[in-house]
Amino acid sequence: PRLLACLLTLGPLALNLGAAEQTRKPNVLFIAIDDLRDWVTYFGRNAQTRTPNLDRIAARGVAFSRAYCAAPVCNPSRAALMSGLRPATSGVYDNNNDWRTVLPEDLMLTAAFRRAGYLVCGAGKIYHESFSRRSEWDDYLDKEKKEPDPAPGQSLGVGGIRFAPLDCRDDELVDWKITDYGIRELGKRHDRPFFLAVGLHKPHMPWNVPRKYYDLFPLDQIVLPPHLANDLDDVPAAGRRMAKPEGDHAQMLATGRWKEAVQGYLAAIAYTDMNLGRLLDALEQSPERDNTIVCLWSDHGWHLGEKSHWRKFALWEEATRSTHIWIVPGLTKPGAICSQP
């Protein structure tokens, strides 16, 4: 909800502050990243992660160190962000709720920009993909190619936690094609301001990315996230049911592959960071560079064994904290960090 309000107010503010230099409303580059927790270099929350391009984006604007999602689940988080209505208002609480039945098209962020005269276009995962409403967009990349499979006989992960290095090129994954769409749009000269949404899938599972990204994180150097074996001892029954320690975490301990899973998540983040670098390069070369607001966000965080829990679907810090950066030319202070929730 706060993000929606910011987008609808910062645009006019930026226009007014820079009226002498600007000839029209500022553009918006709206970058969504799936399942990215706060393992970004500039926060220092994980010494192993490698996010030089996220750091580049943060260095140009303001990063929010205590940004939290509306719900630690893809569908309700994204529906809340795009509508400005919290799950308690919309009734969209899980991935099976069709938000389109309760959130009319003219309520959404895309509609606000279209009413303001913007070209509204996008690619990738902005809404949860079980439900989509393409009529909200002037243009959208619909066809995403199939990704390569791991080699025959290769382990696919542990239970539902899926990860495997791939022997393929960077451009064989869907996120490359999504990023290409954003690069093309940034390179065009548009006859009206644009709202360009780029939704990257990684580091959502499966953490199947080219092997070279796994090689950045040698297994013998992987450090597990902070955890206590008895961390759930003082948690009430409802919290234990939320953690499900007998599920993913029990399998991870039984197989001894916890470090491999952490390696896979770090590798998927590194692959995403590479695509962010490509997108940022295109923005810096764009004729609209100095008149484009950048809003980068992730839909929620992710547990990798903290409190014996994996995935999101929990109300602890690791699942609810998200990555969030703004660049507003003429307004944000480069390299600033806001620690207010």
Segments from the language model and where they lie:
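Bacterial N-terminal signal peptides that target proteins for export
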Residues: 1-7
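Formylglycine-dependent sulfatase
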Residues: 8, 12, 17-341
